[in-house]
Amino acid sequence: MVSLNYSSSPESRVLARLTGGGFDRAKTAKSIEKFIAGYVKAARAEGGVVVGLSGGLDSAVVAALCARALGGSGRVLGLILPGASTPNEDVEDAAAHARELGIEHQTINIEPIVERCMQVLPDIDNKVARGNLTARVRMSVLYYHAYVGRRLVAGTSDKSEISIGYFTKFGDGGADMIPIAGLYKTQVRELGRYLKVPGAILQKKSSPRLWADHTAEDEIGMSYETIDPILYMLVDRKKTAKEAAAALGVPIDTVKRVQAMVVKSAHKRAMPAAPPRL
């Protein structure tokens, strides 16, 4: 895993720009809440929204924003969807935060659904394939409840995950709106502090929990404190890999790794390919 000294390095200044005094947390929250309320109204989603609650940072922030935008009682449904690799503490953290927000919430164990699917699928020992199946089962359960309750599905991916493709296509990437799509992971954490998300969730390592001991940063191979300044330079500032590396004082190979993730995952951010109009 890449480990960099942020105490005096150039990228620390970029990170500070993203999450420090230049990041107006109150204004950002108000803007996103206005977006949520307006989108739900325009869609005539009488039931409000349904959010998948993982017990992690992103879903906690999205749930809090939705509760503030729509009012907690009845218009926000939080679904906690544990699988075989979901720690009990995640379920408990998600439920406790939902109660704190005053939103309706339910816990549905999706493992029987995943297991039934595996019984009729080829017996292949591939944890990523099974993990992606798990994510897509969660999406299906969210949309089931959305349809029944006349709700929209509020996605919980952030700009870091979307940019590098760290989500399952038609799984956790499937949503009607993604309130924090414009915020990098480090910014979401700062917004979480403003929204008074519990400390246990704020400090928890990001993980989709698709298999045992699964954490995002271990799978990616670097921290979001490293990824976000690089993405800012590549995506927002439109710098080349060489320019970004020079500006941040990081190895060019590290920048190119992030750049490669962005390029390789472009299909995840696009509509399905179709032939030219005949």
Question: Model segments located where?
Answer:
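Catalytic subdomain that performs nucleotidyl-dependent activation
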Residues: 99, 129-138, 152-229
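Intrinsic disorder and flexible/low-complexity segments
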Residues: 241-278
